[in-house]
Amino acid sequence: MPGRERRDGGRSADENKSNDRNERRGGGRRDDRRNQQQDERSQYIERVVTINRVSKVVKGGRRFSFTALVIVGDGQGMVGVGYGKAKEVPAAIQKGAEEARKNFFRVPMVGGTITHPVQGEAAAGIVMLKPAAPGTGVIAGGAARPVLECAGIQDILSKSLGSDNAINVVHATVDGLKQLVRPEEVAARRGKTVEEVAPARILRARAGQEA
């Protein structure tokens, strides 16, 4: 009819179908990316250590936001720590987890425990870590336990010698884990064989793994 307006803005039926197909493709790609991100996150162990609310005084009053300290690991020697800040708690946790994955590092282990005693320090936090015999479990409390569990350490002795602040304890634990070296590295540095520098328990644990 002459006076009737076209609701599709003058587009033909073929153009409308093409646009519908493009929208479905775009939505499918977004769904694929979302599913891929969920799969990647499900592969890791996440632990939220602390959530704090912080406020900022502005002209109109106070603005509140949240910070989250998150530990992420694969349970097989890889672990990282992240700190996220956002206006909502879930967003802060997500940002912390993303930063933790960017900060991944590998922890040298033999038979489910660390390779040698070490002491980590960060600010006022001091954490002592010692290898333990199989079956001991993770003897750790407070904020150090999530770091060790996410790294996949099964047997270890730890003790906090400094501040009880969770952030300091976490970073002191990470500092200690980063100081660990493999027996092969020590042997190469000293110009000796692994059997000459490694304790007997390390050699037994390695033999058990290879068997």
Swiss-Prot record:
Pfam families: Ribosomal_S5, Ribosomal_S5_C. It comes from the Bacteria. GO terms for biological process: translation. Residues 1-41 are annotated as: Disordered. The N-terminal domain interacts with the head of the 30S subunit; the C-terminal domain interacts with the body and contacts protein S4. The interaction surface between S4 and S5 is involved in control of translational fidelity. With S4 and S12 plays an important role in translational accuracy. This is Small ribosomal subunit protein uS5.
